[in-house]
Amino acid sequence: MSKKNSTPLISAVNLTCIREERLLFDELSLQINAGDIVQVEGPNGSGKTSLLRILSGLSQPYDGQILYREQLISHCREEFHQNLLYFGHLSGVKGEMTAEENLDFNLALHGNKTQESLSYLAKVNLSGFEECLASHLSAGQHRRIALARLYQSNVPIWILDEPFTAIDKQGVASLERLFSLHAERGGCVILTTHQDLISIKPEQIKKITLDYSYDSAVD
């Protein structure tokens, strides 16, 4: 991972988002730099997941642009996605593989076969489930397998939608420490959560609040 520099990792310029004829946010601009931990806040339905999907290039805004290192992501999509880890509501876990095999598969995809998957599963409270087929595990356990990939990841941009769901207090604290370390190494973390980030220094956290004051229908 590269060291911190003055070029923003992600820039959003005048984003407008409309879903089901509702205006969620309008002319939203932001810059996310290496070292940033950005917490997106707002009530349910305010557009938090929509914003994360737009920032990750998985959804298109009604208007506005997303840039990666000052280039439109449409011009560098492959490079952008190689430097992005997105954690959404779908885990991406393969049911025909065990929990350990899912992590080994992820390591193999990224050209790194030397790290120990068992220790990562322990960090997300899945010790004892290493040899269980993922198809026999719960949805919450699938999310924990997906979260274990964070401990394997060297990509700079992490975009995480409610990463603390189904994680106990010890696991949350461990993830928060990981986020701080990732930021200190020159990465960035963009996440939604209703929890306070108590293990992260307040000066490390930037907050974006989505809370449109009226339910605006679009003609």
Curated annotation (Swiss-Prot):
Primary localisation category: membrane
Subunit-structure text: The complex is composed of two ATP-binding proteins (CcmA) and two transmembrane proteins (CcmB).
Keywords: ATP-binding, Cell inner membrane, Cell membrane, Cytochrome c-type biogenesis, Membrane, Nucleotide-binding, Translocase, Transport
SMART domains the record matches: AAA
Domain ABC transporter: from-to ranges: 10-218
Family: Belongs to the ABC transporter superfamily. CcmA exporter (TC 3.A.1.107) family.
Single GO MF descriptor: ATP binding
The keyword Translocase appears for this protein: yes
Subcellular location: Cell inner membrane
PANTHER family recorded: ABC TRANSPORTER I FAMILY MEMBER 1
GO biological process: cytochrome complex assembly
Binding positions for ATP per the UniProt entry: 42-49
Enzyme class: translocase
Catalytic activity of the protein: heme b(in) + ATP + H2O = heme b(out) + ADP + phosphate + H(+)
Record bears the keyword Transport: yes
Gene Ontology CC: plasma membrane
Protein's membrane topology: Peripheral membrane protein
SUPFAM superfamilies reported in the protein's UniProt record: P-loop containing nucleoside triphosphate hydrolases
Gene3D superfamilies hit by this protein: P-loop containing nucleotide triphosphate hydrolases
Protein name as it appears in the record: Cytochrome c biogenesis ATP-binding export protein CcmA
Gene that this polypeptide is encoded by: ccmA
Described function: Part of the ABC transporter complex CcmAB involved in the biogenesis of c-type cytochromes; once thought to export heme, this seems not to be the case, but its exact role is uncertain. Responsible for energy coupling to the transport system.
Source organism phylogeny: Bacteria, Pseudomonadati, Pseudomonadota, Gammaproteobacteria, Alteromonadales
E.C. numbers: 7.6.2.5
Disulfide linkage: none
